[in-house]
Amino acid sequence: MWDIDFNRLRDVFVYDPQAPMIFSSGIFLWLFAAFILVYLLLQHRLTARLLFVTAFSYYFYYKSSGTYFFLLALVTVSDFFIARFMAGTSVGWKRKASVVLSLAINLGLLAYFKYTNFLGDVFASLLGGTFHHYDIFLPVGISFFTFQSLSYTIDVYRKDITPLTNLLDYAFYVSFFPQLGAGPIVRARDFIPQIRRPLFVSHEMFGRGIFLIASGLFKKAIISDYISVNFVERIFDNPTLYSGVENLMGVYGYALQIYCDFSGYSDMAIGIALLLGFHFNKNFDSPYKSASITEFWRRWHISLSSWLKDYLYISLGGNRKGKIRQYANLVITMFLGGLWHGASWNFVVWGLFHGIALAAHKFWMTLTGRKKGEESHGIRRFFGILITFHFVCFCWIFFRNADFSTSLDMIKQICTTFRPQLFPQLIAGYWEVFVLMALGFFLHFCPDRWENACCKTVTRLPLMGKAVLMLALIYLVIQMKSTEIQPFIYFQF
């Protein structure tokens, strides 16, 4: 007789808000192994394969956000038919009204689920009243799939792409599970041509996919989660209980945590896509190696920064209407980019700081006569990296803290109670955390050729060697995991 644990079986199919499905969870890793087997069986049956992947993607989203998967379906169906309507008319006002409707649907959903309570507080404060918060659930990844779908309708409006005629293809594009929860934001012009190509995964694609999944899992589940639970959260939850040097180390820890968390997710998403025969563009390119804030935004969350540039900054006028307008457009773009991350004044401040810094750097480039893209070298680059990294860390204080006053408390502690003599004691008390932090920053700052060499080594491993590598990593993750699942940070956006 089979001894079936029906409770465990139920957990596979029923949404649990306390245990959302994420790439680093055990249930996903086992389900993905089964998914790959079915995917390979359907390799010569295109329509069945697209249906299977789309259904799995909706299941994946249901396990992350429950019944709110209907929002994903709503955005998909509405934008598909809006784009079809735009393609069928050459009347200017009809096309413009259609893209405005797409904007209203996507941004309206985003505004309700993400900004209702924030805007209520703002208006109540302005009018001298009070606002009682609504209990509104924030669906995972809503900022990502609305922006991704919006880029499609805007591109159709601009006549940059030809709209799809098959709803299944569009549903596949919007819901493709590797990037559904937290990006990268994949452009239609890059992804859609890949949908109906014959399934092909080269030896190099397979090897790089395994390497990216392994490195992403290592960054997320071993480095990011461990330093978060065992150090960073304690500092940020009560900064006034800790000295300035402890707060500063906490900020450095968060800078590494958010990078390893988000780039780890992106690496896993890109790696999983490669195993399925799809190519995504790189989303992170060693951002803390940047010698200027402009370079940082060319390396950090590349899919979002390029989206903001192409669909917001350029739409505002970009650099075409004079320097003053360019600087204002940069600040406005980053202000809205801050709001995209969350409904809080902390995110507004974070975005404004980055916008002002970008404008200041553009002004400095003009003042010194340096050309766009011109890189510094030697000692100038070293100090550029040092200054940029610490500016970004300063901004992370506002990004991470729950409110503005806590951010100011942390800055005050760093400036007034530094106490460097406590550093040896701090290292002794948290030596495991600092070993992982040192390892994380070392891996980040090591030359790109080292990463490429590691990738080639994994690619050359036989299939059994790759399996042993993944099993060993999974075992290590299980040994080091905290008692609770640590969702990816960008799931909340």
PLM ranges: what are they?
Residues 2-492:
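Membrane-embedded transmembrane alpha-helical bundles that form the catalytic cores
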